[in-house]
């Protein structure tokens, strides 16, 4: 599997241009430590109208951090492509944590899927940003495709589960209070 994954990564390296390099570095920086999505969650949580969405985002991000970055990364202990082939010039600092799953992809899809499940109009651009973030991790040679795929799947499942639970709880609360 690593051979195919390296072939994909090397093909992306052949497509590099200065303009796309700069764009990918910027896009990936939005996922650094999840700060963009955490700030978005805090902002949404601070308004009554979007409080539940913000809470779902922050809950998803916390769960994903614990499951993906703290537990699974250390259990899988997968080396990064840039560790295995240091001859490829990186545009970002060499990451120090393990590769599987991609934390950037995980947090981006948690945030974007939460937004999409509450508001499709804003969810589509959020999902586009999440896809670009996931792609940037491949372009920048810091993750294997399966790392990114795992982050996407985990982020989607976690966000969907949190939102589904929150919406069920809201329906239950509405029924108990007599709201239609």
Task: Describe the function of each predicted region.
Residues 1-36, 69-97, 173, 177-180:
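N-terminal transmembrane-helix/juxtamembrane module of multi-pass inner/ER membrane proteins
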Residues 14-25, 45, 49, 53, ...:
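Membrane-helix interfacial "entry" motifs
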Residues 19-20, 34, 49-54, 118-125:
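Membrane-helix interface segments
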Residues 40, 46, 89-180:
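Membrane-embedded catalytic cores of phosphoryl/pyrophosphoryl-handling enzymes
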Residues 40-68:
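Interfacial segments of alpha-helical transmembrane regions
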Residues 58-74, 124-137:
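Small-polar-interrupted transmembrane alpha-helices in polytopic inner-membrane proteins
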């Amino acid at each position: 599997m690593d051979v195919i994954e390296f072939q994909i990564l090397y093909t992306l390296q052949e497509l590099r241009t200065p303009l796309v390099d700069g764009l990918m570095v910027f896009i990936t920086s939005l996922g650094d430590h999840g700060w963009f999505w955490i700030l978005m969650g805090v902002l949404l949580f601070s308004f009554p109208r979007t409080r539940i969405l913000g809470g779902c985002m922050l809950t998803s991000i916390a769960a994903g951090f614990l499951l993906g970055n703290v537990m699974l990364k250390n259990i899988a202990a997968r080396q990064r492509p840039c560790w295995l082939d240091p001859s490829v010039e990186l545009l970002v600092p060499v990451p120090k944590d393990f590769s599987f799953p991609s934390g950037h992809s995980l947090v981006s899809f948690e945030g974007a899927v939460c937004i999409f499940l509450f508001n499709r109009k804003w969810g589509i651009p959020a999902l586009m940003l999440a896809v670009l973030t996931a792609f940037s991790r491949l372009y920048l040679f810091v993750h294997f495709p399966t790392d990114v795929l795992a982050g996407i799947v985990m982020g989607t499942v976690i966000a969907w589960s949190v939102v589904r639970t929150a919406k069920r709880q809201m329906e239950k609360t509405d029924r108990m209070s007599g709201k239609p």
